[in-house]
Amino acid sequence: MGRTREAGCVAAGMVIGAGACYCVYRLTWGKDENEKLWDDEDEEEEEEEESCSGKPEIGGKTVKERKTHVGVGAGAKPQDDSKSKAEANVGPENGPDVKKEVYPESHSEGGLEAKAKALFKSLKEQASAKAGRGIRFPNISRIRTLTSSLPCPGGRGGGCHPGRTGSRARNRTSGKVKRKNRSKSNKAPATAWPVRRGKFSFPYKIDDILSAPDLQKVLNILERTNDPFTQEVALVTLGNNAAYSFNQNAIRELGGVPIIAKLIKTRDPIIREKTYNALNNLSVNSENQGKIKTYISQVCDDTMVCRLDSAVQMAGLRLLTNMTVTNHYQHLLSYSFPDFFALLFLGNHFTKIQTMKLIINFTENPAMTRELVSCKVPSELISLFNKEWDREILLNILTLFENINDNIKSEGLASSRKEFSRSSLFFLFKESGVCVKKIKALASHKDLVVKVKVLKVLTKL
């Protein structure tokens, strides 16, 4: 109930705030329109007075016919062009036959309008005198003073009002632009993940289980196209079909392994990731491993140099782990042992676990022990035996230590300790004694499975 009540309060606050903003907007918009109306009328009056005073009369008529306004200070009301104005000849004021235009309103109405305008002007003058500088009031002297920190309201993007010529038309157009901008801003934001769009219509769905002829079509498309979108869809389709044993054989027999593996060289990380995933599913088959072994060194190099903890690196580590389950191709990766241990220390949680699984595959082969324990490793690797790590990491590092310790005994490497440097894995695990102290400290771990594993390792020392 507490969360429901909080949500209701938040919704009510948003509604009240929106209503207040709308009221302020309506009030300020009407104020601006009212000011523009009076400003336009004042400008027309001043322009007419200047033109009449500056130009002589010719033949009893002024060059520009003067408009007279009924009442003192009264402005002419705006009318449509379709309405004709009444013209009347008034007695000789400035000269004979001076033609003046008057509106067909009554004198009483004009007098009221003049009084209202005079009152409005006096109120504006009083307000400006009280307010002082820096605050915007209706246009009195045609110069609008603004504070340096406040934008001029009513303009576009916080700017000042547009010019007077065609001001109403531009206000209408600017209103339309603002409404369009608001409608565009209401659209849902773009997704965080990049979505590729290709012009090519792929003939199959990525989760379709295809027959051999259909797989051949997909391989042909993958071999001929250079479009990243088409390559990605084809690789995902082949990878999903490679999860089934009957399609693993079909893809190999159709010559699909070299077609897929050629995309390892591409620079697109998404394409490389999908390539590794497809080869990873194919590598479950031992016959396919014989085809993939040609590219295993290239996969290893790319996995080590690509961005740390990236999806490409994880896909490459999974492929290398599958390829080293058996002992047939482990020797092809022995040169990368220092890189694996560096990655074990630098990587995040998931990278550490996947790297441990890969190294454990090597530790289960006694023939790889000498090369494994002689490689240089960072001394910070000992921190993986701390209690702060979760169960999975602790169980993997304990298994790694257990296998290496067993292999050192079985291979008789304990007597040849002089062959190994102080920065080697042999010295860190066997000679320093720090590792054994860390393992003994784990005997008091709160996890029962970790405790059992620690006791098993300690009994073999």
Curated annotation (Swiss-Prot):
Swiss-Prot/TrEMBL GO biological process terms: hematopoietic stem cell homeostasis
**Where along the chain is composition biased (Basic residues)?**
167-185
Q: Transmembrane stretches, by residue range?
A: 7-29
Record's bilayer topology term: Single-pass membrane protein
Using the UniProt annotation, give all residue ranges assigned to the region (Disordered): 34-110, 148-192
Listed SUPFAM superfamilies: ARM repeat
Subcellular location, record wording: Mitochondrion; Mitochondrion outer membrane
- Residues on the Cytoplasmic side? 30-461
Mitochondrial intermembrane face: residue ranges?
1-6
**Which InterPro entries does UniProt cross-reference here?**
ARM-like (IPR011989), ARM-rpt_dom (IPR006911), ARM-type_fold (IPR016024), Armadillo (IPR000225), Armcx_regulator (IPR051303)
* Region named Mitochondrion outer membrane (MOM)-targeting sequence: 1-6, 26-36
Top-level taxon in the UniProt lineage: Eukaryota
Assigned keywords, A-Z = Membrane, Mitochondrion, Mitochondrion outer membrane, Repeat, Signal-anchor, Transmembrane, Transmembrane helix
Q: Which Pfam families match?
A: Arm_2 (PF04826)
**Compositionally biased tracts (Basic and acidic residues):** 96-110
List the disulfide bonds in this chain: none
Which portions of the chain have biased composition (kind: Acidic residues)? 38-51
Query: SMART domains of this UniProt entry?
Result: ARM
* Gene Ontology cellular component list: mitochondrial outer membrane; mitochondrion
Question: Where does the record place its ARM repeats?
Answer: 203-243, 245-284, 366-406, 423-461
Record family assignment: Belongs to the eutherian X-chromosome-specific Armcx family.
Record's function text: Regulates mitochondrial transport during axon regeneration. Increases the proportion of motile mitochondria by recruiting stationary mitochondria into the motile pool. Enhances mitochondria movement and neurite growth in both adult axons and embryonic neurons. Promotes neuronal survival and axon regeneration after nerve injury. May link mitochondria to the Trak1-kinesin motor complex via its interaction with MIRO1.
Give the record's subunit note: Interacts with MIRO1.
Q: What is this protein called?
A: Armadillo repeat-containing X-linked protein 1
Source gene?
Answer: Armcx1
